[in-house]
Amino acid sequence: MNQQRGFTLLEMMLVLALVAITASVVLFTYGREDVASTRARETAARFTAALELAIDRATLSGQPVGIHFSDSAWRIMVPGKTPSAWRWVPLQEDAADESQNDWDEELSIHLQPFKPDDSNQPQVVILADGQITPFSLLMANAGTGEPLLTLVCSGSWPLDQTLARDTRP
């Protein structure tokens, strides 16, 4: 009698099941980014886009533009004139987009060397020549305090963005 050599269907299915389980464990462990990191990146992208628009506005208008940071949001500010003096006023181009400047509720914001506050003075000023007040903005998980992302401005565009768990070279 001729004996066949090869794998039975049961052996093949067992190997496929083991490979599938191993792959799913690896993807679950390493391939999934937590929600807070994703929101930090999305918020950083929105803030970076707003900062770029503020730089363009300062350059094109020839006037400084400020950015005011509070615990709940950032606001673009421009010089406004009153009868006695000038002061910083929020830029009101589109009130419908005002919510786009809010920080995500799951994020804690740490601004260095300044602190977010409720005054009407910007902590960061962008001059008409493109110079920016140097700052560092750390976004952390509000619940755990775990650092998620850092944006650093050394005085000019572009910002340096670093993820806390960044493993890229």
UniProtKB/Swiss-Prot annotation:
Pro-piece positions: 1-6
Residues the record lists as N-methylphenylalanine modifications: F7
Family as reported in the entry's similarity comment: Belongs to the GSP H family.
Residues passing through the membrane, by range: 7-27
Post-translational modification: Cleaved by prepilin peptidase.
Membrane topology: Single-pass membrane protein
Cellular location(s): Cell inner membrane
InterPro entries: N_methyl_site, Pilin-like, T2SS_GspH, T2SS_protein-GspH, TypeII_GspH
Main localisation: membrane
GO BP term (any one): protein secretion by the type II secretion system
Protein name: Type II secretion system protein H
NCBIfam families for this protein: IV_pilin_GFxxxE (TIGR02532), typeII_sec_gspH (TIGR01708)
Organism: Escherichia coli (strain K12)
Misc. comment: Part of a cryptic operon that encodes proteins involved in type II secretion machinery in other organisms, but is not expressed in strain K12.
Signal peptide: none
